Amino acid sequence: MNLFTEIRSLVTAELGAMAEAGELPAGLDLSAVAVEPPRDPAHGDMATNAAMVLAKPAGKPPRAIAEALATRLAADPRILSAEVAGPGFLNLRLRPAVWQGLVARVLQAGDAYGRSTIGAGQRVNVEFVSANPTGPMHVGHVRGAVVGDALARLLVFAGWDVTREYYINDGGAQVDVLARSAYERYREAHGLEPEIREGLYPGDYLIPVGEALKAKYGDSLLDKGEHCWLTDVREFATEMMMQMIREDLAALGVEMDVYSSEKALYGTGKIEAALQRLQDMGLIYEGVLEPPKGKTPEDWEPREQTLFRSTAHGDDVDRPVKKSDGSWTYFAPDIAYHYDKVTRGFDQLIDIFGADHGGYVKRMKAAVAALSDGRVPLDIKLIQLVKLWKNGEPFKMSKRAGTYVTLRDVVEQVGADVTRFVMLTRKNDAALDFDFDKVLEQSKENPVFYVQYANARINSVLRKAREQGMDVADAALACADLDRLDHPAEIALIAKLAEWPRLVEIAARTNEPHRIAFYLHELSSDLHGLWNRGNDEPGLRFLQDDPVVSQAKIALARAVGVVICAGLGILGVTPVEEMR
């Protein structure tokens, strides 16, 4: 139920009629024809570029096409006017009945309004968070977790079959550091002084791990060489860290479908199989890379290595996959992991990475393009840093983690709902300021409060109407005398509701869930604006002396509430019915 799609269908149907009448050549490609909100609302309700994109293939001036199309469109009962602007743009105004009818359609559809089928039949894997299992999640992980989970919810809303996945980085040197750090806490649990050397993890969160190791192993690991305990302690500590991470994610309202282990790729032939596939395609060779400019990456060697010809698929330089000593680079298991996702049959892959992984984007896209023969697109979203503020000062420390602010620090102070919404108030690749004081302010400068307050206002109107004996069930409101909604401010609010299905599809196609938060703020602003105008213009108040008029206005308010709740659901935020 997308009004823009419906009007576009009308436009393309009339273009087809023009072709049949000989006014346009037959067989024109209409895929670039769009119907969108105009840049300036004063110009109309919708605008189409049809004449502009068809002028060249049709061999006609765009204005001539636009004028002929305008005449045809004006004859449709939904169109109030069709006016040609500039060189050939066409601005459309819809009749009030179209907007009024949309309110009923929203109420009849309920939370299905705005849902789409554009992703139907397509499987997408969204990998996000994938934090090293070495400690509590920090505030940077929070933003990635929220963006990834909101994106997954958005894609489900738009029809995709979504798998949420976490890649456990348990195959590298950092889990050995974790084991050594946990062992010192194990010694501490036995009353010995821990030796938290430079390079080990200092946080208090490892104290319970040490105590758990003591409970399981007693003193059997004391005074033993590292080779005797490293493997057992590493696996034990990693599992405890993953349990902590799962609990952190749950506190934020995030639940993964799949946890994949990097360690499981080693010794199983999966890395070898992925690289063999690239080898069979002629994309693996032995060579020496030119020394890089600037900072030297850790996988560069001034000697022959096994290289992936990633430049064949858009990368800037070829990438090492095996070092001269025969060990794998960090990139090799990542190739194998993404090949595993390709072989699981996903139609699309999405990775949510921290901004520090920017140098990984081209090589990873090259690998997936090669391994899938270009069939499976990989979209990588980079998450920029979050700067924390409290009492007007940077907020940096956490006793629990030792060096950084944890997810729990944030959620315990402001709650999961506020945290999630604020993390989506900027595009993922823009830095974000998170002020613990401002996100709890009850002011219109606080987008979380502003949207929730709009929903609370709507619910207050519904409660008062019920107290007056009015039937405010959606079915009853959908049958209200909606032609009473004739004020330009009311029509403008309905027009904003009409944008919701289109906005959902755009956000889903671009993998940008922040668009939902932006839209909710705009919709709430329009609702508040109409509400506040009622203070000076009694005719705009939602509750009137005439119950017929009241029911129509309440129907509009309820329709706004339906969309706000649907949008908050995509963001993973619980709607508030009453501000406290």
UniProtKB/Swiss-Prot annotation:
<protein>
    <recommendedName>
        <fullName>Arginine--tRNA ligase</fullName>
        <ecNumber>6.1.1.19</ecNumber>
    </recommendedName>
</protein>
<dbReference type="InterPro" id="IPR009080">
    <property type="entry name" value="tRNAsynth_Ia_anticodon-bd"/>
</dbReference>
<keyword id="KW-0030">Aminoacyl-tRNA synthetase</keyword>
<dbReference type="GO" id="GO:0005524">
    <property type="term" value="F:ATP binding"/>
</dbReference>
<dbReference type="InterPro" id="IPR005148">
    <property type="entry name" value="Arg-tRNA-synth_N"/>
</dbReference>
<keyword id="KW-0067">ATP-binding</keyword>
<keyword id="KW-0648">Protein biosynthesis</keyword>
<dbReference type="InterPro" id="IPR014729">
    <property type="entry name" value="Rossmann-like_a/b/a_fold"/>
</dbReference>
<dbReference type="InterPro" id="IPR008909">
    <property type="entry name" value="DALR_anticod-bd"/>
</dbReference>
<keyword id="KW-0436">Ligase</keyword>
<comment type="subunit">
    <text>Monomer.</text>
</comment>
<dbReference type="Pfam" id="PF00750">
    <property type="entry name" value="tRNA-synt_1d"/>
</dbReference>
<dbReference type="InterPro" id="IPR036695">
    <property type="entry name" value="Arg-tRNA-synth_N_sf"/>
</dbReference>
<dbReference type="GO" id="GO:0004814">
    <property type="term" value="F:arginine-tRNA ligase activity"/>
</dbReference>
<feature type="short sequence motif" description="'HIGH' region">
    <location>
        <begin position="131"/>
        <end position="141"/>
    </location>
</feature>
<dbReference type="Pfam" id="PF05746">
    <property type="entry name" value="DALR_1"/>
</dbReference>
<dbReference type="InterPro" id="IPR035684">
    <property type="entry name" value="ArgRS_core"/>
</dbReference>
<dbReference type="GO" id="GO:0006420">
    <property type="term" value="P:arginyl-tRNA aminoacylation"/>
</dbReference>
<keyword id="KW-0547">Nucleotide-binding</keyword>
<dbReference type="GO" id="GO:0005737">
    <property type="term" value="C:cytoplasm"/>
</dbReference>
<dbReference type="InterPro" id="IPR001278">
    <property type="entry name" value="Arg-tRNA-ligase"/>
</dbReference>
<comment type="similarity">
    <text>Belongs to the class-I aminoacyl-tRNA synthetase family.</text>
</comment>
<dbReference type="Pfam" id="PF03485">
    <property type="entry name" value="Arg_tRNA_synt_N"/>
</dbReference>
<dbReference type="InterPro" id="IPR001412">
    <property type="entry name" value="aa-tRNA-synth_I_CS"/>
</dbReference>
<keyword id="KW-0963">Cytoplasm</keyword>
